């Protein structure tokens, strides 16, 4: 029986729109290469190969495609995919079926081997699993039946462009890293770049003891792992409103936790010689069909933790001019490395991710995603999961405190200014009064006048002092 692959009707429409131009296009099939929902794979997006820098037109045939560019783009796309997704294969749109042309098929197979060779060599960095024999190539020609094969075995695949939407769930746990990782000296330095694979292997070992638990059980003395047949739907609650419409709460009801959680280190923690300390809370969001087994979700989450940790550290190294670090370094994966931003892929509703550097914003995300994946994002499609509410609240409190301080300072300055103005005019009035008294008053009455004046001046001064005390 032929393997069954699911795609959406919108994907076929996309292929047809490319084919209608009568030109050659090549790209990547992104999705789930393995499922527990009765399918051998699910395609969730088709990302075309972008134009080369300074290039004005796309390649005219598979023979004109730069294989190195294909490999680099595949690695870049894999970095943007959460742990439940991978690069499943390639699609080719051309006036003729490339799988039926011996020469073109040979070139295509060579490109696939180069991609898989890099994936195999960097399987730990890319967090890739799966059987290479299942790598797909989809050939589409306008007016002809779509052909999809496992390129290595030449086995045809039954691909269905479904019109009925698939129900997806977004699982959003957070995984805390706070650990000293051993490093090997390379030359005279402990180089993170050269020890990255070793660090990730240690992290993989830690994740072997990680498991899913429900949020309501968090902190219990004994927490059982999920059962083999438990489904992801168990993590979501459903209620009906007054109109009878069923509403599903996507509130995260699980956590990924290790059996030996470490206490948070102090800011001045000392890292032993030959080690690097990684700390931070990694935000994970994976999209899975609603009937996916939780045992599979665990595997996807472990993969996502490794993939995002590797991506962050690699990007961190790339933006550092000098990759030589002291032995006491502590890397905060939340503040020292780029932010991870998730975005929704329409119309399926699944989520992919991207990494942005300090100073970049929504426009940077939209521009990068459009360039690499040919996805037009709406503002509501971008999900800033790595802006913790606690930090937002702290920032808000800080801003409010600063505003109040400025307000109080301004009111205090205003009070002192008013006091000085009153004193100035009181002094003038006193001088005028003294002049009038000495010129117009009889000396016999002068003592009485001065006494009344002193009493009035004292009353005014007491009122000004009282007003100053009442000012916040």
Language model segments and positions:
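N-terminal beta-strand/alpha-helix entry module and adjacent surface
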Residues: 1-88, 93-195, 199-206, 210, ...
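C-terminal functional modules of predominantly eukaryotic multidomain proteins
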Residues: 153-472
């Amino acid at each position: 029986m032929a393997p069954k692959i699911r795609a959406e009707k919108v994907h076929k429409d996309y292929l047809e729109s490319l084919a209608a131009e009568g030109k050659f296009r090549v790209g990547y099939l992104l999705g789930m290469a393995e499922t527990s929902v009765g399918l051998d794979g699910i395609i969730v997006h088709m990302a075309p190969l972008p134009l080369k820098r300074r290039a004005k037109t796309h390649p005219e045939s598979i023979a004109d495609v730069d294989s190195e560019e294909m490999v680099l783009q595949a690695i870049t796309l894999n970095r943007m995919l959460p742990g439940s997704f991978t690069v499943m294969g390639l699609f080719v749109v051309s006036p003729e079926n490339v799988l039926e042309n011996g020469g073109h098929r040979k070139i295509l197979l060579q490109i696939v081997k180069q991609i898989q060779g890099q994936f195999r060599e960097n399987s730990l960095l890319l967090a890739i699993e799966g059987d290479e024999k299942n790598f797909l190539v989809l050939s589409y020609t306008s007016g002809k039946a779509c052909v999809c094969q496992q390129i290595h075995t030449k086995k045809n695949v039954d691909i269905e462009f479904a019109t009925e939407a698939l129900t997806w769930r977004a699982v959003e746990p957070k995984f805390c890293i706070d650990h000293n990782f051993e490093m090997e000296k390379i030359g005279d330095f402990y180089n993170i770049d050269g020890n990255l694979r070793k660090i990730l292997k240690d992290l993989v070992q830690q994740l072997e003891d990680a498991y899913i638990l429900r949020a309501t059980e968090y902190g219990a003395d004994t927490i059982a792992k999920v059962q083999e047949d438990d489904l992801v739907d168990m993590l979501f609650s459903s209620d009906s409103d007054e109109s009878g419409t069923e509403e599903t709460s996507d509130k995260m009801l699980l956590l990924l936790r290790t059996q030996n959680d470490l206490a948070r280190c102090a800011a001045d923690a000392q890292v032993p010689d030959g080690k690097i300390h990684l700390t931070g809370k990694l935000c994970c969001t994976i999209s899975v069909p609603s009937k996916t087994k939780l045992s599979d979700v665990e595997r996807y989450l472990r993969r996502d933790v490794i993939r995002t940790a590797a991506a962050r550290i690699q990007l961190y190294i790339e933006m550092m001019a000098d990759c030589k670090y002291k032995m006491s370094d502590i890397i905060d994966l939340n503040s020292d490395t780029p932010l991870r931003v998730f975005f929704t892929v329409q119309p399926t509703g699944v989520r992919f991710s991207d990494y942005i550097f300090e100073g970049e914003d929504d426009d940077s995300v939209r521009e990068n995603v459009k360039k690499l994946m040919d996805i037009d994002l709406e503002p509501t499609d971008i999900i800033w999961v790595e802006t913790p509410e606690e930090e937002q609240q702290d920032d808000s409190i800080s801003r409010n405190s600063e505003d109040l301080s400025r307000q109080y300072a301004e009111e205090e300055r205003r009070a002192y200014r008013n006091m000085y103005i009153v004193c100035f005019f009181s002094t003038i009035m006193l001088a005028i009064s003294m002049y009038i008294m000495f010129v117009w008053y009889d000396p016999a009455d002068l003592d009485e006048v001065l006494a009344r004046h002193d009493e009035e001046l004292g009353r005014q001064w007491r009122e000004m002092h009282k007003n100053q005390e009442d000012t916040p």
